[in-house]
């Protein structure tokens, strides 16, 4: 029996980045031998065990053979005779196919992963790459993480990703897994690389058609020097990641705020009148298909519907501001307002030449929200009021508070 550290922990060590979970591969062992040493079996589809003290995952070396459609259509062989090199060969990218003997510090790198780390290239391990459609999503997600380090996708790997997209295999991806990869990309340093990689691989359309529909749609150059709505979408996603690092609620709402522009009739280009209302339908469709959590959908709908109103909040009547807050459920969910402000700021700054622009509207929104929130029904004299009259009096008092906070 021989144990090696594999995968992301080895890769991140070589990149001099903090490592996440430690994954281990065990060569030359059987499940019975693992359990005899105190390991607990947890793998459903292949033999994975938890270490009795650390709780880290130890998987028996295995090979995988394609047996059906999708990323679950594989036959697994975890015979004790499977070698380390055979186990590494089934992995997706060379940078993830490096093992380390922790006793000696020796690296086992049969597929050139160290070279590709040095050259900042994301490259597939072998021709079996095309057997798993999930790898297209993983490539895009890794690019969202590693593009800031200078990584690019190898041309031959991109060609295989396009082959997968053309095969129809992407249709076999389950919604939960698509959302899982998208969510990870949104909290990466450069979500735009996720979008751009899928777009270049012709995979964004099959997976996220609402987002693909924005590429090639022009906007008015005086407001959007980047012109292409798809590029604006990328810039807004990166700005959201910068303004709210690690917040996938902000990331998702910022990503989907302009979906309505993909539905603008071409004869109306480059104007997109009513795109904020038009965007709700494709947003709902995307959320239903990927089973997006309700909290994410509610914030995204609020940002999609109201971002133009927030941009011009100084022009809105005080009563209109209160109505805006009500539509966002901001008086019942006050934590939502700061995120809406961040999404709108990402929209305003996610434009060519506007990356460092101020966005005072965000502070105005938060200030007026606090003013409205400071007035509660218990603060009013409602002795002679009943039913709807109490609500009307509360609304009037809140409008007055908003006016005073201007």
Curated annotation (Swiss-Prot):
List S-S links within the chain: none
Binding locations of Mg(2+) = 21, 23
**Annotated catalysed reactions:** a tRNA precursor + 2 CTP + ATP = a tRNA with a 3' CCA end + 3 diphosphate; a tRNA with a 3' CCA end + 2 CTP + ATP = a tRNA with a 3' CCACCA end + 3 diphosphate
One example GO MF annotation: ATP binding
Transmembrane recorded as keyword: no
Q: List required co-factors.
A: Mg(2+); Ni(2+)
Q: Which UniProt keywords apply?
A: ATP-binding, Hydrolase, Magnesium, Metal-binding, Multifunctional enzyme, Nickel, Nucleotide-binding, Nucleotidyltransferase, RNA repair, RNA-binding, Transferase, tRNA processing
EC number(s) on record?
Answer: 2.7.7.72, 3.1.3.-, 3.1.4.-
Q: Give residue ranges for domain HD.
A: 229-331
Q: Which residues bind CTP?
A: 8, 11, 91, 138, 141
Cofactor stoichiometry and binding?
Answer: Magnesium is required for nucleotidyltransferase activity.
Q: Quick check: keyword Metal-binding in the entry? A: yes
Q: Which GO terms describe its biological process?
A: RNA repair; tRNA 3'-terminal CCA addition
Q: Which residues bind ATP?
A: 8, 11, 91, 138, 141
Q: Which Pfam families match?
A: HD, PolyA_pol, PolyA_pol_RNAbd
Comment, domains: Comprises two domains: an N-terminal domain containing the nucleotidyltransferase activity and a C-terminal HD domain associated with both phosphodiesterase and phosphatase activities.
Q: What else is known?
A: A single active site specifically recognizes both ATP and CTP and is responsible for their addition.
Subunit:
Monomer. Can also form homodimers and oligomers.
Stated role: Catalyzes the addition and repair of the essential 3'-terminal CCA sequence in tRNAs without using a nucleic acid template. Adds these three nucleotides in the order of C, C, and A to the tRNA nucleotide-73, using CTP and ATP as substrates and producing inorganic pyrophosphate. tRNA 3'-terminal CCA addition is required both for tRNA processing and repair. Also involved in tRNA surveillance by mediating tandem CCA addition to generate a CCACCA at the 3' terminus of unstable tRNAs. While stable tRNAs receive only 3'-terminal CCA, unstable tRNAs are marked with CCACCA and rapidly degraded.
The record's section on PANTHER family has: MULTIFUNCTIONAL CCA PROTEIN (PTHR47545:SF1)
To which protein family does this belong? Answer: Belongs to the tRNA nucleotidyltransferase/poly(A) polymerase family. Bacterial CCA-adding enzyme type 1 subfamily.
Please state what the protein is called: Multifunctional CCA protein
- Source organism per UniProt: Stenotrophomonas maltophilia (strain K279a)
